[in-house]
Amino acid sequence: MSADVPVTVAAVRAVARDVLALELRHANGQPLPGASAGAHIDLALPNGLVRQYSLVNATGQATMDCYQVAVGWDANSRGGSVWIHEKLKVGQALRVTHRATCSEMAPEHRRVLLLAGGIGVTPIYAMAQACAQQGVDVELWASARSAPRLAYLEELKALLGQRLHLHADDEQGGPMNLTERLATQRWDAVYACGPAPMLDALTAATAHWAPGSVRMERFKGAEQPASERQPFELVLQRAGLSTTVDAHESVLDAMERVGVDFPWSCREGICGTCEAPVLEGEVQHLDYVLSPEERAEQRRMMVCVSRCGGGRLVLDI
């Protein structure tokens, strides 16, 4: 979905320390387009920002009465979470500008482990509901810095019972030991969402697992050190345009600077919306969308984060 949908904030409630849950309903009272578990929406805020939030209640319905999202407080954010926590009120008019699914569940996976860290529980909670509805054998490990920060705790307990395993870092003396817990592959797949250290640990702990059995959603893409960024020439073949991408800007920034309106959503390398075909150039892939095989082909890139390792990049745009 790419057309704007006007929504109204119907309810706001706290679901954990520093986590607010929002209930969004169509401004005209109509049903909202449905979505599969793992989907997110782009929410346009009155302060001009557009932010992505996972749909907590998306389980594959054709239509939905409301969209439910949760927003964690982040003092270092670019303004989205702070505005919602400090300014948002019931009755506020907002716009949903896009809906997409980055981590759709595979139907062939019948024994599933869900792994959530912090606010990463939002898409994972939706997946847990979908698994329960579809009769999938599911287990969920949820972790947070402290127990009061575990969002949707009561709902998860009611849904999963003994299949829910909780981990509070402050009570356990540190993060969950995934290397020890995942030494043996007992599931068809793991779906995970959480902070980078948790997902990096998951990647290392499951390196011996079957390819494609670990799927994760990150909060943001990888960052290339400033010292490694070099300017390069960007050629947009079909548009007949060329420009220099400076060290401090992205390919997407440069495209917009020369007047090319290209679709994007996250600007973090995690959603796949800004995928572009590559005709020439050595791509430095910094996204979390493409597989290692797709990266090696050097045929496409996410222009919001990935760069060129040589002096010239030619895109089929």
From Swiss-Prot:
Subunit structure: Monomer. Part of the p-toluenesulfonate methyl-monooxygenase complex TsaBM, comprising the reductase TsaB and the oxygenase TsaM.
Ranges of residues in domain FAD-binding FR-type: 2-108
Pfam families noted in UniProt: Fer2 (PF00111), NAD_binding_1 (PF00175)
PROSITE patterns linked to this entry: 2FE2S_FER_1 (PS00197), 2FE2S_FER_2 (PS51085), FAD_FR (PS51384)
Record's keyword annotation contains Lyase: no
Positions annotated to bind NAD(+): 110-220
GO biological process per UniProt: catabolic process
Lineage summary: Bacteria, Pseudomonadati, Pseudomonadota, Betaproteobacteria, Burkholderiales
Function according to Swiss-Prot or TrEMBL: Iron-sulfur flavoprotein carrying electrons from NADH to the oxygenase TsaM. Involved in the toluene-4-sulfonate degradation pathway.
InterPro entries assigned to the protein according to its UniProt record, in alphabetical order: 2Fe-2S_ferredoxin-like_sf, 2Fe-2S_ferredoxin-type, 2Fe2S_fd_BS, Beta-grasp_dom_sf, FAD-bd_FR_type, FNR_nucleotide-bd, MRET, OxRdtase_FAD/NAD-bd
Binding site for [2Fe-2S] cluster: 266, 271, 274, 304
Organism: Comamonas testosteroni (Pseudomonas testosteroni)
Record key words, sorted: 2Fe-2S, Aromatic hydrocarbons catabolism, Electron transport, Flavoprotein, FMN, Iron, Iron-sulfur, Metal-binding, Monooxygenase, NAD, Oxidoreductase, Plasmid, Transport
Protein known as: Toluene-4-sulfonate monooxygenase system reductase subunit TsaB1
Alphabetized PANTHER family for the sequence: CARNITINE MONOOXYGENASE REDUCTASE SUBUNIT, NADH OXIDOREDUCTASE HCR
Segments forming a coiled coil: none
Cofactor list: FMN
Enzymatic class: oxidoreductase
MF terms in GO: 2 iron, 2 sulfur cluster binding; metal ion binding; monooxygenase activity
Top-level taxon of the source organism: Bacteria
Gene3D superfamilies the UniProt entry points to: 3.10.20.30, Nucleotide-binding domain of ferredoxin-NADP reductase (FNR) module (3.40.50.80), Translation factors (2.40.30.10)
Residues of the 2Fe-2S ferredoxin-type domain: 230-317
Enzyme Commission code(s) on record: 1.5.1.-
